[in-house]
């Protein structure tokens, strides 16, 4: 069976001319996740325009985020940064009374070298609201990496001891060294993954981030930590280096294969023998058969924009798809080591070529390759989706994978629901015989 | 610094990109950090564009901060020249890149030595002008560039056409109902026997710009884009222009009369009065509609208007003059055009508001409590919250404001569309009366037995909480599926475990 056609993983790096969301977009899901927070994005009209358009209707629901829009006086340092931020934060405190204010630094604050990290502690002491600074800018990061910068900053704020000894019970009863998971997930998914581990006798003593800033988990030296998303390498580094925790390097719980591998790795570190995992995985695969039969033997091309690409490619390979290319904004080979190993093992197992991983892709070149390869499905950003559809190529917007629930056994079906949707829809349309809708070549 | 949740007009480079991407074979390169190419998403999503948006970024990253972006920008311009062979490449700075104070003009000059295409640097200041002003300026810049070029090659077509002809200036990508408006204008000019010389910038070629002066006059349908170009052409080539927006019956007539006066002054002998009368009374439905008894119910109803200068002014006039509606206040976010706006609407409303602060507009609406709002998508959402109907009449807009069907706001068909929009925004006349007489809708509770009420399945407190977290529009389905699953495996308490088991096993 496993006559491996592939040797090692091949990595390429292109020009970085690709479309992705600005990392400040993390504000849109993090403000909903952290219920007592307020996010202040310190930037220009361009940042604000992106947020208001990308977040669509959400903007009208009185969001707990706003722009501190820089004006000419701020750029030329005619105005005093401290005074300006103080004025705005006092107003936010008065209007919303949050438990924490996040300052999201942008490209502009980087270029004019506004000392947010220096100002924050002083202002925090003065107005008595915690201020956490994250530099989620487009000079350094792409899309989901924004969350990474915020969580890395939050990791420093996790308490060393519980203030209230009475709710210490969960830690005391834990039969193993405490485990803290990191990555922002919708509450139902948090519950699902926590329960999945509980079945194996593993207790999650906290999540970074928690539902409220005031409930950030205790993180002490020697604790174990595990990531749930592939784009959290800075957070992982911070937890290891600054908080002296031990990182469990595992594939990510995306797809039944990933979820099982994730749990198994955690169990092995905790010296727990996993029970019933194999059967559970099998049952999930069986329940997915109706969707898998639609994509088995088909090909997929990831243009790359959100760093979930390797995990999704690995899952889709296991579903029987051929992956032509994995475009990805940034590849941390250390943090994703276990995921990359599982990708390789999956390719061997399914007897398919290892796809090329293209870091910092060049969208123009990619469209050329897509024309040559004619994949059955292209997973891409919204800038390219309609033009590709008009040329008869099935596409799925990559952004949906970041907003849908895709983690754990329970949500494997949701990933396939997304992946198969264009195929299911276009199957009926192709019978009409109009595949190309553009007069350009 | 300004605390801002929402803005009516976007940053300057968006205006430049809207102009550049409207022309054929013009490619824009943004000097911008990763993620600033959101314009491509808007084109592709809102306009459902079938083709790749001709905009790429020359990405500003850490390396650029350290070393400058000269090589990169020049390389990106020459690369696009090879790949797409455009007629023109426009380099546009963004908010971020403009503070780097690199000599972009120098890069443009250097690149243009190596390119087949012309190369221009968009002349916009990100901290002083907004999207609309930048668009106006960029169009003028491109037209000026090609007119100057044609002049030095002696290629300007100054010979006027034999019969009256016009250039329509200001049809722009991502403009509010622009494409429909332009189609309607073409029809109008055809009716008036005026030949259309050129329509710019949408779908135009920069190579044809040298033919602009052969038209008798220029027509500027929207205040926001085209005026600067019209003034340039007036100064350089002595071309007159008409800038009365033909929106509404009265203004359309005023616009046509102004055209008549203009072409007659240039030697034509036309009389459009009969055409105006025929269109107004018998072809367009809206004048008759205003007169019909149904429309009487709108008399004196209170409305407010907010939008860009063109649309807010025109709609205010229509509501007041043509429909007898009381406009409590009308406003615009085009602060730079305040004087013109006030002058236009002063006599048609109680108060004029000029502000780009949506919080202030929201508060004012709440205080005014109008029967209907005519505004942008922002006012629509304010209306939703206050339970006041809203007709969307101006950008900024969402995807539903890019309708597939024919919906012009300009010309005689436009008057029909606007009449429908206004009428449908108010609670219908008769319904209104009946509700008043009978004191609201029938409130007797409908007798119905829900499926889930048949047998008793209990939800644990935890599961119930989880259920409540599920968004409202799918909650019912999840509840039914879960209960069916529990019933099928004879469980009468739904716990979190049961809930997720159901999700895994019941294929939705």
From Swiss-Prot, chain A:
Residue numbers binding [4Fe-4S] cluster: 22, 47, 107
Compartments, record wording: Plastid, Chloroplast
Main location: plastid
Enzyme kind, highest EC tier: oxidoreductase
Cofactor binding note of this UniProt entry: Binds 1 [4Fe-4S] cluster per heterodimer. The cluster is bound at the heterodimer interface by residues from both subunits.
Chain segments annotated as coiled-coil in the UniProt record: none
Keyword annotations: 4Fe-4S, ATP-binding, Chlorophyll biosynthesis, Chloroplast, Iron, Iron-sulfur, Metal-binding, Nucleotide-binding, Oxidoreductase, Photosynthesis, Plastid
InterPro entries referenced in this protein's UniProt entry, alphabetically: LIPOR_BchN/ChlN, Nase/OxRdtase_comp1, Protochl_reductN
One MF annotation (Gene Ontology) recorded for this entry: metal ion binding
Catalysed reactions listed for this entry: chlorophyllide a + oxidized 2[4Fe-4S]-[ferredoxin] + 2 ADP + 2 phosphate = protochlorophyllide a + reduced 2[4Fe-4S]-[ferredoxin] + 2 ATP + 2 H2O
Gene3D superfamilies referenced in this protein's UniProt entry, alphabetically: Nitrogenase molybdenum iron protein domain
A UniProt-annotated Pfam family: Oxidored_nitro
Keyword DNA repair in record: no
E.C. code: 1.3.7.7
A single GO BP: photosynthesis, dark reaction
A GO CC term attached to the entry: chloroplast
Pathway membership: Porphyrin-containing compound metabolism; chlorophyll biosynthesis (light-independent)
Domain of life the protein comes from: Eukaryota
Family: Belongs to the BchN/ChlN family.
Subunit structure: Protochlorophyllide reductase is composed of three subunits; ChlL, ChlN and ChlB. Forms a heterotetramer of two ChlB and two ChlN subunits.
PANTHER family with a match to the protein in the record: LIGHT-INDEPENDENT PROTOCHLOROPHYLLIDE REDUCTASE SUBUNIT N (PTHR39429:SF3)
Function: Component of the dark-operative protochlorophyllide reductase (DPOR) that uses Mg-ATP and reduced ferredoxin to reduce ring D of protochlorophyllide (Pchlide) to form chlorophyllide a (Chlide). This reaction is light-independent. The NB-protein (ChlN-ChlB) is the catalytic component of the complex.
Name listed for the protein in its UniProt record: Light-independent protochlorophyllide reductase subunit N
Source organism per UniProt: Pyropia yezoensis (Susabi-nori)
Species lineage: Eukaryota, Rhodophyta, Bangiophyceae, Bangiales, Bangiaceae
UniProtKB/Swiss-Prot annotation, chain B:
Active site, per annotation: 294 (proton donor)
Keywords assigned: 4Fe-4S, ATP-binding, Chlorophyll biosynthesis, Chloroplast, Iron, Iron-sulfur, Metal-binding, Nucleotide-binding, Oxidoreductase, Photosynthesis, Plastid
Iron-sulfur recorded as keyword: yes
Record GO biological process: light-independent chlorophyll biosynthetic process; photosynthesis, dark reaction
Coiled coil: none
Similarity field: Belongs to the ChlB/BchB/BchZ family.
Assembly with partners or alone: Protochlorophyllide reductase is composed of three subunits; ChlL, ChlN and ChlB. Forms a heterotetramer of two ChlB and two ChlN subunits.
InterPro entries, alphabetized: ChlB/BchB/BchZ, LI-POR_suB-like_C, Nase/OxRdtase_comp1, P-CP_red_C, Protochl_reductB, Protochlorophyllide_Rdtase
Sample GO molecular function, one term: oxidoreductase activity, acting on the CH-CH group of donors, iron-sulfur protein as acceptor
UniProt source species: Pyropia yezoensis (Susabi-nori)
Source taxon at top rank: Eukaryota
Residues where [4Fe-4S] cluster binds: 36
Gene3D superfamilies (UniProt xref): 1.20.89.20, Nitrogenase molybdenum iron protein domain (3.40.50.1980), Proto-chlorophyllide reductase 57 kD subunit B (1.10.8.550)
Task of the protein: Component of the dark-operative protochlorophyllide reductase (DPOR) that uses Mg-ATP and reduced ferredoxin to reduce ring D of protochlorophyllide (Pchlide) to form chlorophyllide a (Chlide). This reaction is light-independent. The NB-protein (ChlN-ChlB) is the catalytic component of the complex.
EC number(s) stated in the UniProt entry for this protein: 1.3.7.7
PANTHER family, A to Z: LIGHT-INDEPENDENT PROTOCHLOROPHYLLIDE REDUCTASE SUBUNIT B
UniProt cofactor note: Binds 1 [4Fe-4S] cluster per heterodimer. The cluster is bound at the heterodimer interface by residues from both subunits.
Pathway per the UniProt entry: Porphyrin-containing compound metabolism; chlorophyll biosynthesis (light-independent)
Positions annotated to bind substrate: 429-430
Protein name: Light-independent protochlorophyllide reductase subunit B
Catalytic activity: chlorophyllide a + oxidized 2[4Fe-4S]-[ferredoxin] + 2 ADP + 2 phosphate = protochlorophyllide a + reduced 2[4Fe-4S]-[ferredoxin] + 2 ATP + 2 H2O
